[in-house]
Amino acid sequence: MACILKRKSVIAVSFIAAFLFLLVVRLVNEVNFPLLLNCFGQPGTKWIPFSYTYRRPLRTHYGYINVKTQEPLQLDCDLCAIVSNSGQMVGQKVGNEIDRSSCIWRMNNAPTKGYEEDVGRMTMIRVVSHTSVPLLLKNPDYFFKEANTTIYVIWGPFRNMRKDGNGIVYNMLKKTVGIYPNAQIYVTTEKRMSYCDGVFKKETGKDRVQSGSYLSTGWFTFLLAMDACYGIHVYGMINDTYCKTEGYRKVPYHYYEQGRDECDEYFLHEHAPYGGHRFITEKKVFAKWAKKHRIIFTHPNWTLS
C-alpha cells in the first residue's frame, strides 16, 4: 500500500512539474523570446509564438471609418512590421525579413518600388497624414490601383476631414474611392483624434495644442498598431538620444529622397515654437510603451533601460 501511495505521489508531482514547465515555456516563447533572439542578432520576425497557429477573430476599431461603406475598420495582426521612412533604412537589406511579417505598416507616401531590398515589397496598412494625401494623389494608380489590397488610414483635423462637403481632404478621398472602387480608405474619427491628443497629454504632461505642436504620423501608427497587433517590430526608427550619440550615422530624413539631415530635422521640430512635431518627445514615449507591450526596435537597436 505504501508503494502504491508513493507511486501516486510521484506521478502527481511529475504532472504538476510538467504543467508548470509547459506554462513557463509558453510565457517565455510569447513574451520574451523575440527580444532574446534580437539580442543575439536574430530577427524577431522569424519567431512564431505558439498562439500564432490559429487565427483570432478580426478586431473592430470604431475610431476608423471606411469612406465608401461607412463601416468601422476590422483588423487583427500577429507580428507587425512598422517600417520607418527614415534614411536609416538605406543599405539595411532587410526587405525579405520585413515581407515575412504578417502585417506590414508604412507611413505617408513612402514607396517600395526601387527600395525593395532594404524596405520590402508588401504593404498591408499605410497610415497617412492629411497633408500627405495630395502626395498619394500625384501617383494614384500606384497607391490605389496596383496596391488596392492595402488598407489606408488617414488622420487629420476636423476642418479637413468633415463630411458636410467642406472637408477638403475628405472630399479628395471620397472622389478617390469613386475612381478606384476597390480602394480601402479609412478616416480617423474626431473622437479618435481627441483620444490621441489625450494620450499625448497623459504621457508628456503637455497639452498638444497649447504646446504649439502637431502629432506625427508615427504617433497615430503606434496607437493603432498597439490595438491591432500581437507584437510589433519597428525598423529604422531612432530613439530620443540617438542624435546626441558620438559618431551617429548621418542620413537623410527620408530614405527615398535627398533632404535635410535626419537629426537636424528632429532638433528643428522639437524646438519649434509653433507647428512642429515633437519627434524626440514622442520617441521617449515609444520607449516607455515598449516596456509594456511586445515592441522591439532594430536598425538601429534600442536599449530600453
Curated annotation (Swiss-Prot):
Its EC number is 2.4.3.7. PANTHER family: ALPHA-N-ACETYL-NEURAMINYL-2,3-BETA-GALACTOSYL-1, 3-N-ACETYL-GALACTOSAMINIDE ALPHA-2,6-SIALYLTRANSFERASE-LIKE (PTHR45906), ALPHA-N-ACETYLGALACTOSAMINIDE ALPHA-2,6-SIALYLTRANSFERASE 3 (PTHR45906:SF2). This is Alpha-N-acetylgalactosaminide alpha-2,6-sialyltransferase 3. It is a single-pass type II membrane protein. CDD domains: GT29_ST6GALNAC3 (cd23975). InterPro entries: Glyco_trans_29, GT29-like_sf. GO terms for biological process: ganglioside biosynthetic process; glycoprotein metabolic process; glycosphingolipid metabolic process; glycosylceramide metabolic process; oligosaccharide metabolic process; protein glycosylation; viral protein processing. Its main location: Golgi. Disulfide bonds join 80-229. It is an enzyme of class 2 (transferase). Residues 1-8 are cytoplasmic. The chain crosses the membrane at residues 9-28. It catalyses: an alpha-Neu5Ac-(2->3)-beta-D-Gal-(1->3)-D-GlcNAc derivative + CMP-N-acetyl-beta-neuraminate = an alpha-Neu5Ac-(2->3)-beta-D-Gal-(1->3)-[alpha-Neu5Ac-(2->6)]-D-GlcNAc derivative + CMP + H(+); a ganglioside GM1b (d18:1(4E)) + CMP-N-acetyl-beta-neuraminate = a ganglioside GD1alpha (d18:1(4E)) + CMP + H(+); a globoside MSGG + CMP-N-acetyl-beta-neuraminate = a globoside DSGG + CMP + H(+); 3-O-[alpha-Neu5Ac-(2->3)-beta-D-Gal-(1->3)-alpha-D-GalNAc]-L-Ser-[protein] + CMP-N-acetyl-beta-neuraminate = a 3-O-{alpha-Neu5Ac-(2->3)-beta-D-Gal-(1->3)-[alpha-Neu5Ac-(2->6)]-alpha-D-GalNAc}-L-seryl-[protein] + CMP + H(+).
